[in-house]
């Protein structure tokens, strides 16, 4: 049987490789100066003291973290409340005692998140946007480092620092670079390593840990595709799969992003290892478990892409492929199969009964697997058969949503 088309999964993975643009911020007037507790309701833990200032602050952060995050109102409220508590702590020793590592961390998080809105402020000049973003990041880092000076063993504060660094690299630095940029003083590798040094799996907040790892995932994607934005966008708008091939961009060694590109493989390995640790520390009944497993599946499919591409070019040689020995071809096949099978393990864990899209992801991985197995072998036929069955069930459950994908596969 000939190689089957990659279909939805492959196209989706290619289309995801783009730099996310910052959404235009809400036109709602700023309420920075409005007293927080008189303007918003805050959900507290069942056992929380209604008069506990820190509990209310944690409630505000949770409100923002679990929202659509399309409005800076809650963030301004957090900053306002933190400033208020700091002022009160100067005269009230009891309040000062409550300003623990969580207080400093939430304060720093709010400041760092406000950079997103500052970067997207279309009413400000480009110079002011850059200045505001830099200023808020500096204030956020200053706040978390102050917290660490008081609570040096706080895992939460170290994690917050890592988050700010991972967020700052693309938003403040890379966003202002172009293909010919040269800046010897801008050490992006050093900053990334500094963030990784402070990162650890925070068992008290799996969602927060997951989000920070996703920031690294997004950062590596931005680094890998730096300068390709236009070609990627054209690929998204195109129905021609061949036109979605990314154009290789060669950066000069002096470019600040160049060293990061050279360390991509090691950083992706670090990312996979930490997502794997996070999955091991997450109960299977937690909603986020599937999201972690899905991300791991996608990362292993990505790892399989290059050896898969090499093997398939040899398997279906059109005469343009570089001549290699049978042993080399077998080695690259085994490497691609290893990573694809690993991806399937995670995607199976991420499959949700009420979400046919997750079934299709598994089916697409089986197609990838079949393409890598020996041509017309029993194993290949079994992989394709499994993919067809899953696609059929997903199409039926979704009332024909995946008919084109199924037809495309069967015609292959």
Swiss-Prot record:
Modified residues (Phosphoserine): 30
Keywords attached to this entry: Nucleus, Phosphoprotein, Transcription, Transcription regulation, Translation regulation
Biased composition (Polar residues): 32-41
GO cellular component: nucleus
Subcellular location: Nucleus
Span list, region Disordered: 1-45
Protein family (similarity comment): Belongs to the ETT1 family.
Entry protein name: Enhancer of translation termination 1
Source organism of this protein record: Saccharomyces cerevisiae (strain YJM789) (Baker's yeast)
């Amino acid at each position: 049987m000939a190689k089957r088309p990659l279909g939805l999964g492959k196209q989706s993975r290619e289309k995801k490789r783009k730099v996310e643009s910052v959404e235009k911020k809400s036109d709602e007037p700023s309420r920075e100066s409005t007293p927080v507790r008189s303007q918003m309701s805050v959900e507290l833990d069942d056992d929380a003291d209604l008069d506990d200032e820190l509990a209310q602050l944690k409630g505000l952060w949770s409100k923002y973290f679990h929202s659509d995050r399309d409005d800076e109102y809650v963030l301004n409220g957090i900053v306002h409340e933190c400033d208020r508590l700091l002022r009160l702590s100067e005269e009230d020793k009891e309040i000062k005692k409550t300003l623990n590592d969580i207080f400093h961390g939430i304060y720093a998080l709010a400041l760092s998140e406000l950079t997103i809105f500052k970067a997207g402020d279309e009413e400000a000049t480009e110079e002011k946007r850059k200045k505001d973003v830099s200023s808020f990041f500096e204030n956020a880092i200053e706040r978390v480092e102050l917290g660490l000076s008081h609570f040096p063993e706080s895992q939460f504060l170290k994690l917050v620092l890592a988050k700010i660094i991972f967020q700052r690299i693309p938003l403040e630095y890379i966003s202002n670079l172009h293909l010919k940029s040269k800046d010897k003083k801008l050490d992006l590798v050093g900053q990334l390593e500094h963030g990784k040094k402070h990162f650890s799996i925070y068992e008290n907040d799996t969602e927060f840990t997951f989000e920070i790892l996703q920031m690294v995932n997004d950062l590596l994607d931005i680094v890998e595709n730096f300068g390709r934005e236009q070609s990627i966008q054209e690929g998204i708008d195109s129905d021609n799969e061949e036109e979605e091939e990314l154009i290789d961009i060669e950066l000069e060694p002096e470019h600040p992003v160049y060293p990061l590109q050279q360390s991509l493989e090691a950083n992706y390995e670090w990312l996979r290892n930490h997502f794997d640790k996070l999955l091991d520390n997450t109960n299977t009944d937690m909603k986020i478990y599937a999201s972690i497993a899905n991300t791991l599946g996608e990362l292993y499919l990505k790892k399989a892409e290059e050896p898969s591409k090499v093997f398939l070019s040899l398997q279906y040689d059109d005469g343009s492929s570089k001549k290699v020995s049978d042993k080399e071809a077998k080695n690259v096949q085994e490497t691609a199969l290893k990573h694809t099978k690993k991806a399937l393990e995670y995607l199976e864990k991420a499959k949700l009964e009420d979400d046919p899209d997750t079934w299709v992801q598994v089916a697409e991985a089986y197609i990838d697997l079949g393409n890598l197995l020996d041509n017309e072998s029993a194993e290949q036929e079994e992989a394709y058969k499994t993919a067809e069955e899953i696609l059929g069930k997903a199409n039926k459950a979704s009332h024909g949503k995946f008919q084109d994908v199924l037809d495309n596969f069967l015609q292959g």
